[in-house]
């Protein structure tokens, strides 16, 4: 069954607090957009320059949600009353569940903020590595940061989140420290399991696991199995990029969903913007095979540029063809990034990030489209999200029709497929080029595979530029 996930940063939603995720917001997500899950990014307490206890090594003013300072706390700035922040978090969880939604938060296993309180207290700092150390050290060497850090000193230096060096560069994750994992069980494993179980006990329904390729698969296998023994319905989503390892992360490690950034996302972006042939969409699903239902499809998230930005499609309407394929091609889960459905462009210059086509995760900023949505864009998104929940799309079979087309059908710019659950059937035609009329033929073998008897098998349709057409054929 099709699962829809909505990612948002609570600090940029509504009033910027847990209380801003209120009944009105949840009704919008559930009733207007048909969401099943809400992924709240930036809940667990992270390094920030704001508030009563500002940290010194921070990217931006608000700080990255992925530089965790305390794994057992939430950000005070998200609470109306900072002293009651955990109670306010639990109240938000209850509202989410009462609305028929489930909650995802981030689990960041690879690294922590430099001023983290949960790790390193018992480390032997005289050696570079020891199996029971939480961090990697550079004995005798101070940390040399690429930026000024308000008098912060670290001696000996520790390895940063993505680089083994006492002198990380400006493009490195210098505000974080890499955690030490072994391929065999250590106390770091136990600490991380305790953290995940803590949040599961708070009512969290799933974890989006950050950069899992940087931690041992053996650890994630053990952690997922351990959590699911107590919480069998807990969902784990992996941020992964190596397609060759997809099957391992599903079948051996145990993840429920995987980012398909390196597959369908990259393909659709290249077809939409860089002239790649639409044939690549077929090649991508063929390479995935039976893994398709485990892929998390998306066109935006906090790491990627906005579809409507000058770096991608330049306007939201030019992303409709890609949206139709990403959302409707199969019954894989689909993720929407807050403001995407309203036409957000992400073209403001924002502190640490600058003008990069993204909504900054490092600074206090605005999402203008949430305040003044493009109503025509919101209507189109609401409509196609509704169709994605129809049984033919939510759990039906897919038949790629591109191979059997000819004439004015352009396999480099057009992509057509049919979906059916045996009772209802639909034809979807996506056009990545200019407005064009073309004919789509449905062969007998497609009808047999889909279990339908269509009244017509030849359709001449006009599909607008960078758009799609959806037709019911049974």
What are these regions (language model features)?
Residues 8, 40, 71, 96, ...:
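Conserved, mostly hydrophobic/aromatic
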Residues 456-474:
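C-terminal beta-strand-rich structural cap/linker in extracellular carbohydrate-active enzymes
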Residues 7-19, 67-86, 174-188, 204-214, ...:
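The substrate-binding groove and active-site-proximal loops of carbohydrate-active enzymes
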Residues 403-445:
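Carbohydrate-binding surface patches
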Residues 48-68, 109-165, 251-259, 350-359:
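Aromatic- and acidic-residue-enriched segments that line the glycan-binding/catalytic groove
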Residues 4-6, 38-40, 103-105, 207, ...:
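Hydrophobic faces of well-ordered beta-strands that scaffold small-molecule active sites
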Residues 1-102, 110-112, 117-121, 128, ...:
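N-terminal structural segment of carbohydrate-active enzymes
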Residues 194-197, 205-295, 325, 343-383, ...:
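Active-site-proximal helices and loops of the catalytic beta/alpha 8
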């Amino acid at each position: 069954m099709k699962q829809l996930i909505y990612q948002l940063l609570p600090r940029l939603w509504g009033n910027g607090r847990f209380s801003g995720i209120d009944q009105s917001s949840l009704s919008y997500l559930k009733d207007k957009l048909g969401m099943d899950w809400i992924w709240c990014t930036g809940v667990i307490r992270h390094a920030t320059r704001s508030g009563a206890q500002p940290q010194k090594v921070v990217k931006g003013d608000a700080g990255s949600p992925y530089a965790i300072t305390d794994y057992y706390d939430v950000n005070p700035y998200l609470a109306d009353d900072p002293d009651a922040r955990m109670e306010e978090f639990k109240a938000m969880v209850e509202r989410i569940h009462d609305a028929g939604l489930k909650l995802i938060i981030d689990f960041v296993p690879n690294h922590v903020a430099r001023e983290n309180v949960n790790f390193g207290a018992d480390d032997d700092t005289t050696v570079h590595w020891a199996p029971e150390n939480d961090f990697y050290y550079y004995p005798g060497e101070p940390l040399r940061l690429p930026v000024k850090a308000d008098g912060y000193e670290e001696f000996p230096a520790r390895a940063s989140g993505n680089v083994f060096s006492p002198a990380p560069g400006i493009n490195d994750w210098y505000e974080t420290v890499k955690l030490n994992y072994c391929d065999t069980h250590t106390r770091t494993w136990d600490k991380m399991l305790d953290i995940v179980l803590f949040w599961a006990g708070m009512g969290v329904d799933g974890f989006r696991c950050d950069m899992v390729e940087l931690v041992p698969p053996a650890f994630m296998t053990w952690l997922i199995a351990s959590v699911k023994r107590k919480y069998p319905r807990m969902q784990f989503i992996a941020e992964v990029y190596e397609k060759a390892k997809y099957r391992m992360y599903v079948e051996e490690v145990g993840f429920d969903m995987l980012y398909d950034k390196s597959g369908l996302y990259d393909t659709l972006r290249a077809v939409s913007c860089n002239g790649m042939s639409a044939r690549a969409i077929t090649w991508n699903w063929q390479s995935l095979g039976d893994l398709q239902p485990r892929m998390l499809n998306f066109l935006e998230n906090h790491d990627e540029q906005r579809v409507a930005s000058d770096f991608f499609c330049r306007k939201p309407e030019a992303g409709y063809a890609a949206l139709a394929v990403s959302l409707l091609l199969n019954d894989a889960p689909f993720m929407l990034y807050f403001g995407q459905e309203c036409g957000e462009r992400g073209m403001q210059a924002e502190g640490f990030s600058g003008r990069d086509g993204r909504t900054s995760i490092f600074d206090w900023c605005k999402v203008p489209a949430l305040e003044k949505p493009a109503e025509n864009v919101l209507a189109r998104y609401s409509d196609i999200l509704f169709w994605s929940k129809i049984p033919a799309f939510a759990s039906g079979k897919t038949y790629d029709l591109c191979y059997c087309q000819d004439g004015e059908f352009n396999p480099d710019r057009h992509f057509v497929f049919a979906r059916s659950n045996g009772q209802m059937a639909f034809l979807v035609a996506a056009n990545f080029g200019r407005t064009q009329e073309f004919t789509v033929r449905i062969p007998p073998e497609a009808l047999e595979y889909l279990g339908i008897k269509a009244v017509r098998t030849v359709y001449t349709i006009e599909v607008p530029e960078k758009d799609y057409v959806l037709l019911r054929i049974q």
